[in-house]
Regions:
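Residue(s) in the substrate-gating loop at a strand-loop-helix junction
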Residues: 140
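Conserved glycine-rich cofactor-binding loop
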Residues: 9, 14-18
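Alpha-helical segment proximal to the catalytic Tyr-Lys
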Residues: 125, 169-170
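Conserved mid-core segment of classical short-chain dehydrogenase/reductases
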Residues: 91-106, 129, 149-152
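Conserved glycine-rich Rossmann-like NAD(P)H-binding loop of the short-chain dehydrogenase/reductase
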Residues: 30-47
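Active-site helix of classical SDR
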Residues: 120, 156-157
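Substrate-binding pocket helix/loop in short-chain dehydrogenase/reductase
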Residues: 72, 96-98, 104-109, 135, ...
Length: 207
């Protein structure tokens, strides 16, 4: 199926593995040129090289911590005028309500709320000027059905949902759409970690 996006340019965060990598491969399969970002340079470049070889699209890789101002500046400078933005970040650690303090919530908000907002604000003006843009935020099914051990994630991602609900309506007339993806269970490193934590807390085998 041709989605009509061949030749577009996309920035995809946390794209060296997992859902971000899957999004990158899907967009590359549609002929979209990519800017990939993750913190680990080695795995990021391996993913970029694989996509270049497989799909023949332009792929630039920026290893940086996207939750920092310096990291955002580096990624956005390389990305330039993008047509598609996919925000994505690893979820905060699981735990109990009594485990989390103010610093834990601030870290969760930085990664899963404030960073996507900063990238959206940086990308929207150009998209609106050109009359076309697609922004997709990978959040979690926990936004609709909160998961008890993921209180940090539940809180931050719900905040992003509220922000996007308002902004998407404000910019829809400019040819720009903003949507959230709420993935459920996928075979990723994140799910393996959560299973280990849950099994340990319940004193049972991971199997």
């Amino acid at each position: 199926m041709d989605l009509g996006i061949r030749g577009r340019r996309a920035l995809i965060c946390a794209s060296s593995k997992g859902l971000g990598k899957g999004c990158a491969e899907a967009l590359a399969g549609e002929g979209v040129d990519l800017v990939l970002n993750a913190r680990g340079a080695e795995s990021l470049e391996a993913t970029a090289a694989s996509i270049r070889s497989t799909y023949g699209v332009s792929v630039e890789a920026v290893a940086a911590d996207i939750t920092t101002e310096a990291g955002q500046a580096a990624v956005l400078e390389t990305a330039g005028d993008i047509d598609i933005l996919v925000t994505n970040a690893g979820g905060p650690p699981p735990g109990l309500w009594s485990d989390w303090g103010r610093d834990d919530f601030i870290a969760a908000f930085d990664a899963n709320l404030l960073t996507p907002i900063a990238l959206i604000k940086a990308s929207l003006p150009g998209m609106m000027d050109r009359g076309w843009g697609r922004i997709v935020n990978i959040t979690s099914v926990a936004v609709k059905a909160p998961i008890p051990v993921l209180g940090l994630s539940n809180t931050a991602r719900s905040g992003l949902t509220g922000y996007v609900a308002g902004v998407s309506r404000q910019v829809a007339g400019s040819g720009v759409t903003i949507n959230n993806l709420l993935p459920g269970l996928h075979d990723t490193d994140r799910l393996v970690t959560l299973d280990k934590v849950d099994a340990g807390a319940r004193g049972i085998s991971e199997d």
